[in-house]
Amino acid sequence: MQELIKRAKELLADGTVVRVLGWKAGDLAFNPEPAYFETPESLEDFVYDGFCGANLSKYMIEASKLEGKTMVCLKPCDTYSFNQLLKEHRVDREKAYIVGVGCKGKLDIEKIRKMGIKGIRGISGAEITGDAETLTVDTVYGEKTCAYKDAMLERCHVCKGKEHKIYDELIGESKETKDADRFAEVERIEAMSPEEKFAFWQSELSKCIRCNACRNVCPACSC
């Protein structure tokens, strides 16, 4: 992460970019949030770890409307999204300085909680650098551990690959995480009878409260 911060400061200092789009620390160790950084000093709040799962490509839609170039940190999967937005002329390639960042799979705090780990105060082992395969979770009840792989987001288990499809420079190494078939769930649904499919979608759509979270999380949202 320090290499990423150092490079961001250099690009701001020499005028290559006027802002950096990355992640800042949240209230808790496991909820970093997307943020703009416009000064080298503000980058003290910059973070990049296993919980930075948010895709920053869609934020470039608005950033493309601003004056000057934006340095944006994109994981390998995020670059697919950026390319799609580029094809739809929704982002301006000339307004983006893309730094491809390494990824070894992103983490899901809900999976950790479902393991019975409660009262979480902090988590170590989520750093991007290093080959830690175990997370150490500091809780109000003492330290707990779990396998990094067991806490990964479902989408990381069906990762399309760790190759960045578009970038200006690369920082950090990636680690393959795919260990499942991307279309297994699709095939399961396709194998259902019409009655089973109807019941399945009825159950899924019954959860909808029109919060627009599905729209916000969609990597392109061009429906």
What are the language-model segments listed below?
Residues 153-156, 205-211, 215:
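Residues immediately within or flanking Cys/His clusters that coordinate Zn2+
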Residues 221-223:
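Short, intrinsically disordered, charge-balanced linker/junction segments flanking boundaries
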Residues 1-201, 219:
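Iron-sulfur-associated redox domains of electron-transfer enzymes in respiratory
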